[in-house]
Amino acid sequence: MEVSIFDGIEPDPSVETVMKGADAMMKFQPDWIVAIGGGSPIDAAKAMWIKYEYPDCTFEDMCKVFGIPELRKKAHFCAVSSTSGTATEVTAFSIITDYNKGIKYPIADFEITPDVAIVDPELAETMPKKLVAHTGMDAMTHAIEAYVSTANCDYTDPLAIHAIEMIMKDLTASYNGDMEARDRMHNAQCLAGMAFSNALLGIVHSMAHKTGAAFADYGAHIIHGAANAMYLPKVIAFNAKDETAKKRYGVIVDYMGIADKNASDDDKVSALITYLRKMNDELNIPHCIKNYGADSYPVENGFVPENVFLERLHDIAVNAIGDACTGSNPRQPSVEEMEKLLKCCYYDTEVDF
């Protein structure tokens, strides 16, 4: 079997990396593309695959939601995941960063769902603790957002709920070095991916996509999983103003067993928010952007200056509203509400609107 290796994919892969990889594919002309690693290399390979199959396709064309032409005319795709969070090995999504604009763009189309996914828990056993924390909370966010998404259904709900139950039991243990828990987390994140690839996501991801690289000129990124972990409790509080979403959060809490089943839905939502914030503490993840250090750990003064955040707030909010994940959120925010929500995520203030 003749092979060619393309490596060196950076975290949060860039448009430029995608184009270089696509050039390498066009020279080698593979029948199969095998992407090995975490979310970044697999996501990058998905975008390269599109460009390989359609050389005239621009990055802007790729970003048109469910607008990718039929693939597999040149190659099939196999994904081998080595981290326990993105589940990109089973999803219709890829996240690519345009560093010139400081924006992460989701490519969303069922055409880019891999033909084969190899989910081997042993590959995740060497993950560093920080990666365990961030990818694990990414998976938790996938499952919760999928369950309350407007596109949820009878086929996705069991996957989402079981993933939540598994992550609740195993993530902190995995973080603290329990290898059996880490093995189970690898399966849990895949279940969460199967749920959200069909039920879609919500504005936690919209906000994470649009803040992740927005402050890269200040020397760091807001790592995707950490962003999800910080924003998820705030978005739950925002979405719970919608009665349907509030009831579904209540069902999640019933399965988790973290509140009395006879408690009100409002009390159950509060219990869920409290539980997730406690998880963030256990995983050494900050509660807000203001306290997000350049190394992703909690600090008194984070790397994003307040004046810079406020200066860029409106544009980030507009971009988040336009993100592919916003349409399936259970409560549709206005630009003004998105700005207020982002402020709550910066200062760690209560969501009361």
PLM segments and residue spans:
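Flexible, glycine/charged-enriched surface loops at secondary-structure junctions
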Residues: 151-159, 174-184, 199-204, 222-225, ...
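Short, amphipathic C-terminal "tail helix"
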Residues: 303-353
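Gly/Pro-rich interdomain helix-loop hinge
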Residues: 214-217, 221, 225-308, 312, ...
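Glycine-rich phosphate/pyrophosphate-binding beta-alpha loops
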Residues: 85, 190-228, 323-327
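Carboxylate- and glycine-rich phosphate/diphosphate-binding segment that chelates Mg2+/Mn2+
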Residues: 93-199
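Glycine/threonine-rich beta-strand-loop-alpha-helix active-site module
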Residues: 16-23, 27-122
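Short beta->alpha junction loops
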Residues: 5-15
